[in-house]
Amino acid sequence: SLVAVVITTFLYLIFRDSSPKGLPPGPKPWPIVGNLLQLGEKPHSQFAQLAETYGDLFSLKLGSETVVVASTPLAASEILKTHDRVLSGRYVFQSFRVKEHVENSIVWSECNETWKKLRKVCRTELFTQKMIESQAEVRESKAMEMVEYLKKNVGNEVKIAEVVFGTLVNIFGNLIFSQNIFKLGDESSGSVEMKEHLWRMLELGNSTNPADYFPFLGKFDLFGQSKDVADCLQGIYSVWGAMLKERKIAKQHNNSKKNDFVEILLDSGLDDQQINALLMEIFGAGTETSASTIEWALSELTKNPQVTANMRLELLSVVGKRPVKESDIPNMPYLQAFVKETLRLHPATPLLLPRRALETCKVLNYTIPKECQIMVNAWGIGRDPKRWTDPLKFSPERFLNSSIDFKGNDFELIPFGAGRRICPGVPLATQFISLIVSSLVQNFDWGFPKGMDPSQLIMEEKFGLTLQKEPPLYIVPKTRD
């Protein structure tokens, strides 16, 4: 009809010239939806293809949002290092805009005084080498509990991500509160509701919210995602609120100290909301991303028997038949190379967490306008054939004689980010990922349901805040001779 033509023409004229001048090149956007329809279900993969056409930096219009994507080590270095301060703002997903949480969050808040205070506690108290080493026995005991649980399920099909996720929840329960959250295999034990809330948060983080592309929809919460996040946070806070209350009372009646995060946080001067937000992010980031990484690691091991054999030779040489200890990890270069290779191909957050420009600035001679959203395609950088030989081949050997690391200085490998926004828990995360993987390799062979051949294993990805394997990995543990 004539009315439809007039409306369409009007909207086109509005959106046609809405992009700021001087942006990096990119595909031509459609009216209203921009480039949304070009992304498909795997934006990280589509971004890598677009980089082949448009280069280091390209721009998109996602709904009404202007987005710039960095796709090479050079562009990543410019974003995360050279212009780190001015591009250090955080774009907060609509579903996670829970005021009390965002204002006290180390992940989502601006780099303000509260953020600096929280960051300092992480850097100087929680994730120091001394603190990590002092809690090694806790992580080792939880890893062995996982091994014992799987030994009881030899011959049975297990969803390994759930087993690992539960193990990580208990690891963090002990690191933070000095207690298990629940018992593996017993769904009626302990604070199972907290495990369920954490799992639900993972699902919400991996869901799409149209309000991220059309912010005016945020006020309506059409799909109830914001309410779901708020309810999950409240449920989690209520569980450990009781634990914190008990600890405060105990501290008032005796002077004994426990070697855990809560002891440090209660002595740090943080208020309850800051403690709640920090614990949520330690639990959330530590469990969700690490469980995904370990699932991918085991998937690669089952598809690459020679890699498994190489790791077992190293384990036998360094560890023998006793349980693996974290102190063994520095003496196992192949294990370390294996973890790097897993993170290269399967970074848990494929586009990192989006940044936001605090001011208009120039990057590689292009204009990045104020409030622009910036993504760094860590997944694409890790698979770039210009940077890696045979990039799709899983080969830990590529790191054996290489100084490349994932600590934020080598921009061809940035699974944890870089700059002031780098994940503060990198030293801890790499320890328990290495510990759990090596413990599983040492103790088990693996089969597949219905005798499926490893070559048939599907290695598809499900895009979200974390990059999950699709379908999930189901394997059958077998005792080793």
From Swiss-Prot:
Q: Which residues bind heme?
A: C423
Q: Which UniProt keywords apply?
A: Alkaloid metabolism, Endoplasmic reticulum, Heme, Iron, Metal-binding, Monooxygenase, Oxidoreductase
Q: Which Pfam families match?
A: p450
Q: Which reaction does it catalyse?
A: (S)-N-methylcoclaurine + reduced [NADPH--hemoprotein reductase] + O2 = (S)-3'-hydroxy-N-methylcoclaurine + oxidized [NADPH--hemoprotein reductase] + H2O + H(+)
Reading the lineage from the top rank, the first entry is Eukaryota
UniProt pathway: Alkaloid biosynthesis; (S)-reticuline biosynthesis; (S)-reticuline from (S)-norcoclaurine: step 3/4
Membership in a protein family = Belongs to the cytochrome P450 family.
- Recorded source organism is Papaver somniferum (Opium poppy)
Q: Which GO terms describe its biological process?
A: (S)-reticuline biosynthetic process; response to molecule of fungal origin
Expression by tissue: Restricted to the parietal region of sieve elements adjacent or proximal to laticifers in roots, stems, leaves, carpels and hypocotyls.
Per the UniProt record, the lineage of the source organism begins with:
Eukaryota, Viridiplantae, Streptophyta, Embryophyta, Tracheophyta
Where does it localize?
A: Endoplasmic reticulum
| Gene coding for it | CYP80B3
User: Protein name, please?
Assistant: (S)-N-methylcoclaurine 3'-hydroxylase isozyme 1
